[in-house]
């Protein structure tokens, strides 16, 4: 008879240890090892499994062929459909993560109602709330009349048996929402709910159901203090798409971001605004991020960025102030602090702008976060503008990457960035050298910049002209 062998599994990275330790050897986190049992001994190894079941041959098919069902389920919420690549793919599994209270359940409740209004069968299974609580949220959102089927259950076998039964004579579900994966448990694992083994086994069972039946499955995941989805990393590899629902506590907008998508582009974003009646779509996020600009204030530059296939204009704010400290302060919100240090070094080395006796504060307006290097030239322009006390032209946008030699390098999607700027009323742009060939015969002034020193000289000349 197989005996139970004790092992300790890290709840942060999933690493298996033979005995308990205060610190995980794989990820370095403290107090994350939890004792879990596993069957071992005679009759439990791979050889025993092979003796019980022999493999069967499966039919091989080609890439081309007929698709029985429509490939995607369109919700009608354009921002959600944009992020998923045009709708939920049948037979796919999506994982959505976000901070507590950010609006994950609100978003999925509205999506479930929108899909049910289009004639799809939607099943919403909650392991954290009672059915009455879900109904209260639906009433607050004004979608209580939608034909969404609800259940409060945490056992995976019971959930699959419920949505697979045809006692009611209804069709199979088109979309199944599980809120959340950390609350599920399966009879196939002996550990407690929320542990690595249970999360992995429960996710495997739900993904297997999606592939076998063709129903789309959405799994809600908790996040850790670092902003990563809690549980084993293997779950993110198993699912077809990973979405993060982001937002700052002091701002009313939310961003749904694609991190992984097997059926569409990654790095796409959908922007929503949180209101009393739920989440409202923001079709033009650039207007949201540029809503309250002070055009006469030095240290503000508008960056034309890209999020996936969507151009987004955001304001970068810089403040350079004299420092009384031996080591001046460098504070960054919404951008990479290491990249700011590089821009400051290039400005000092190649442009003669000295920041050694000044504190530098950099902020991306609206709580937005920028990760692409195309924002380098906008950051440099904001820093020089604040240092010199010269306001930048209010109808100008900036984009371009700065190298360590002080050269301005070209970036991708220049035309899309310029089109978005022109649509919002901007009339000029500081762009890398060579971008003018892509943008001709327009009532739009392009100032091509080959080196960062050229940009600094232009800003200084504009201030001298005003004096």
UniProtKB/Swiss-Prot annotation:
Keywords: ATP-binding, DNA damage, DNA repair, DNA-binding, Hydrolase, Metal-binding, Nucleotide-binding, Stress response, Zinc, Zinc-finger. Pfam families: AAA_25, ChlI, Zn_ribbon_LapB. GO terms for molecular function: ATP binding; ATP hydrolysis activity; ATP-dependent DNA damage sensor activity; damaged DNA binding; zinc ion binding. Gene3D superfamilies: 3.30.230.10, P-loop containing nucleotide triphosphate hydrolases (3.40.50.300). Has a putative N-terminal zinc-finger, a middle region with homology to RecA with ATPase motifs including the RadA KNRFG motif, while the C-terminus is homologous to Lon protease. A motif (RadA KNRFG motif) lies at residues 260-264. GO terms for cellular component: cytosol. Coiled coil: none annotated. GO terms for biological process: recombinational repair. Disruption phenotype: No alteration in UV resistance; does not replace RecA. DNA-dependent ATPase involved in processing of recombination intermediates, plays a role in repairing DNA breaks. Stimulates the branch migration of RecA-mediated strand transfer reactions, allowing the 3' invading strand to extend heteroduplex DNA faster. Binds ssDNA in the presence of ADP but not other nucleotides, has ATPase activity that is stimulated by ssDNA and various branched DNA structures, but inhibited by SSB. Does not have RecA's homology-searching function. Residues 359-467 are annotated as: Lon-protease-like. This is DNA repair protein RadA. Belongs to the RecA family. RadA subfamily. Its EC number is 3.6.4.-. ATP binds at residues 98-105. SMART domains: AAA. It is an enzyme of class 3 (hydrolase). A zinc finger (C4-type) spans 10-27.
């Amino acid at each position: 008879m197989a005996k139970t062998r004790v092992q300790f599994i890290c709840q942060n990275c999933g690493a298996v240890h033979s005995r308990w330790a205060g610190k995980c050897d794989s990820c370095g986190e403290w107090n994350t090892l939890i004792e879990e049992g596993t069957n071992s001994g005679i009759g439990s190894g791979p050889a025993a499994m092979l003796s019980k079941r022999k493999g069967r041959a499966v039919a091989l098919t080609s890439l081309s062929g007929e698709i029985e069902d429509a490939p995607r389920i369109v919700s009608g919420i354009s921002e959600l459909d944009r992020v998923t690549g045009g709708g939920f793919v049948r037979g796919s599994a999506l994982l959505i993560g976000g901070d507590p209270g950010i609006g994950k359940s609100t978003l999925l409740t509205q999506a479930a109602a929108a899909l049910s209004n289009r004639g799809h069968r939607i099943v919403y299974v909650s392991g954290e709330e009672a059915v009455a609580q879900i109904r209260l949220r639906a009433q607050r959102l004004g979608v209580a009349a939608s034909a969404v089927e609800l259940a409060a259950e945490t056992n995976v076998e019971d959930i699959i048996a419920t949505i697979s039964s045809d006692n009611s004579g209804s069709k199979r579900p088109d979309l199944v929402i599980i809120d959340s994966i950390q609350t599920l448990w399966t009879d196939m694992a002996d550990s407690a709910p929320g542990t690595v083994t249970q999360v992995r086994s429960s996710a495997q069972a739900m993904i297997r159901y999606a592939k076998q039946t063709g129903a789309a499955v959405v799994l809600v995941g908790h996040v850790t203090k670092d902003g990563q989805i809690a549980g084993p990393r293997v779950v993110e590899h198993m699912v077809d798409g990973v979405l993060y629902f982001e937002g700052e506590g002091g701002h009313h907008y939310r961003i749904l971001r694609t991190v992984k998508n097997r059926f569409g582009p990654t790095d796409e974003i959908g922007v929503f605004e949180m209101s009393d009646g739920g989440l409202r779509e923001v079709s033009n996020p650039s207007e949201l991020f540029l809503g309250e600009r002070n055009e006469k204030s030095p240290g503000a530059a508008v960056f034309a960025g890209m999020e996936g296939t969507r151009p987004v204009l955001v304001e970068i704010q810089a403040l350079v102030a004299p420092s009384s400290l031996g080591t001046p302060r460098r504070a960054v919100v919404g951008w990479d602090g290491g990249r700011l240090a590089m821009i400051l070094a290039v400005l000092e080395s190649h442009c003669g702008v000295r920041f050694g006796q000044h504190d530098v504060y950099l902020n991306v307006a609206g709580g937005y976060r920028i990760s692409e290097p195309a924002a380098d030239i906008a950051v440099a322009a904001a820093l020089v503008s604040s240092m010199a006390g010269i306001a930048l032209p209010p109808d100008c946008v900036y984009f371009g990457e700065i190298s360590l030699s002080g050269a301005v390098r070209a970036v991708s999607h220049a035309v899309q960035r310029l089109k978005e700027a022109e649509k919002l009323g901007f009339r000029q742009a500081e762009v890398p050298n060579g971008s003018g060939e892509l943008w001709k015969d327009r009532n739009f002034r392009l100032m091509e910049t080959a080196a960062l020193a050229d940009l600094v000289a232009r800003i200084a000349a504009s201030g001298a002209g005003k004096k």
